[in-house]
Amino acid sequence: MQVTLAVLSATALALLAISCGGSPAAPLAAPSPSVDLAGTWDGTGVDSQGATTVTWALRQTGTSVSGTVATKSADADGSCNSCHRNKTGTFSGTIAGTTLALTIFFAAGVDGDPTPACTATLTGTATSTVADMLTTAYSGADSCEGQFLNGTLVMARHR
């Protein structure tokens, strides 16, 4: 009986020592984004107000994406839509897994903007960020022309 009690006591002390030993685990590093969107992208945007050619120049730090945007109307020069679709602006976005949430903003008063009194903002989500292709659903508004709905951007990256 004394031997059994001694063995049980020794085993309990050994388990206690093992469970208290060692250092705490180091914190896990933040996961790296699963997509890299840095670079120059060209494509087209089509929404309820018309079609636009689009160029992005993007930088990426971790899961944050930023850069510049230039758009040019697919309509003939001189049309109302051509004025409101020829703009330069800013791009900001956040990556979560393989999804990109983005905002594009066109400020009023930009040099060379044919409609300098108008601002425009669009927001969208790209759930298909495969290699050098990206498809984004978007919506937004132009302060002079109103809302644009049911938009789709299809972009390809230059390599």
Task: Map each language-model feature to its residues.
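Sec-dependent bacterial lipoprotein signal peptides
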Residues: 1-19
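Bacterial Sec-dependent N-terminal signal peptides
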Residues: 16-38, 159
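Central antiparallel beta-sheet cores of small beta-barrel/beta-sandwich binding domains
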Residues: 33-125, 145-158
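Low-complexity, intrinsically disordered Gly/Pro/Thr-rich segments
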Residues: 129-144
